Amino acid sequence: MNRTKRSSRRRLPPIRSGEIIDYKNISLLRRFMSEQGKILSRRINRLTSKQQRLMTVAIKRARILALSPFLNNES
C-alpha cells in the first residue's frame, strides 16, 4: 500500500514570542474566537494548554468589560 508523505514543514506558532495575552488586546483575542464569538478549541488554535487557559481567561474578562461580545448573531 502506498502511504502519503506528510510535509515536514513546521507551522508557525499562532502567538509570537513578543505578544502578550491580555484582555485589552482585542485584535489578538479575535483570532482565537469564532465568527459567533465562541472560544475556539485548542486543537483548532494550536495553542499550548497554558496559552489556551490564559486566552480563555482573557476572552472572558474582555466579555465582562464589554470589550468583546458574548454572542455575535449578526448575519
Curated annotation (Swiss-Prot):
- For this UniProt entry, what's an example GO CC term? chloroplast
Give the primary localization class.
Answer: plastid
User: Does the entry feature the keyword Chloroplast, yes or no?
Assistant: yes
Q: Which family is this protein grouped under?
A: Belongs to the bacterial ribosomal protein bS18 family.
Q: Which UniProt keywords apply?
A: Chloroplast, Plastid, Ribonucleoprotein, Ribosomal protein, RNA-binding, rRNA-binding
Recorded GO MF terms: small ribosomal subunit rRNA binding; structural constituent of ribosome
Query: What lineage is this protein's organism placed in?
Result: Eukaryota, Viridiplantae, Streptophyta, Embryophyta, Tracheophyta
Q: GO terms for biological process?
A: translation
Name-wise, this protein is Small ribosomal subunit protein bS18c
Location comes to: Plastid, Chloroplast
Q: Which PANTHER family match?
A: 30S RIBOSOMAL PROTEIN S18, SMALL RIBOSOMAL SUBUNIT PROTEIN BS18M
Keyword RNA-binding in the entry? The reply is yes
Record-linked HAMAP family: Ribosomal_bS18 (MF_00270)
Q: How does it assemble?
A: Part of the 30S ribosomal subunit.
